[in-house]
Amino acid sequence: MSEPTSRRPAYARLLDRAVRILAVRDHSEQELRRKLSAPVMGKNGPEEIDATADDYERVIAWCHEHHYLDDERFVMRFIASRSRKGYGPARIRQELNQKGISRESTEKAMRECEIDWSEMAREQAVRKYGEPLPSNFSEKVKVQRFLLYRGYLMDNIQQIWRNFAD
């Protein structure tokens, strides 16, 4: 039988928790640090893990070493996931920034992802407003506002009507 969690060393408990978190989905390093430092719900309510900063660093290093934690992989999967849900590049960049991903890593991944953002914007507009897309000014403004909210760039949005006019 396993020993009670309170008797296990803090490093072992942190490592176990990190592996459990990363088994569900990829996380950025900053997300993992935040989740590891948050209190754990135990049988008697929230419990703190009495770990040192060195314990956290060792756990993060172990996760990198064993390929459980990889920010590049996380960024690529995050971009793919959010674009499938219909979000544009501006929104995805902002969300990655909130998750602690550097601007350089985000820009590199956005260049490598090979997503046609103009076509994605068109698909979202058609899904919301139907085919053919509105051509009068007030309806176009509604479509633009919707796509800007979804995180598409104005160039991508204007491309819809340029291609439509051809």
Curated annotation (Swiss-Prot):
Q: Per UniProt, what is one Pfam family of this protein?
A: RecX_HTH2
Q: Known Gene3D superfamilies for this protein?
A: Winged helix-like DNA-binding domain superfamily/Winged helix DNA-binding domain
Q: Which domain of life is it from?
A: Bacteria
Task: Choose one Gene Ontology CC annotation of this protein and give it.
Answer: cytoplasm
| Keywords on record | Cytoplasm
UniProt record, GO biological process: regulation of DNA repair
Q: Which InterPro entries match?
A: RecX_HTH_1st, RecX_HTH_2nd, RecX_HTH_3rd, Regulatory_RecX, WH-like_DNA-bd_sf
User: Subcellular location, in the record's words?
Assistant: Cytoplasm
Cited HAMAP family: RecX (MF_01114)
Q: Which family does it belong to?
A: Belongs to the RecX family.
Which function does this protein serve?
A: Modulates RecA activity.
Q: What is this protein called?
A: Regulatory protein RecX
Native species: Salmonella typhimurium (strain LT2 / SGSC1412 / ATCC 700720)
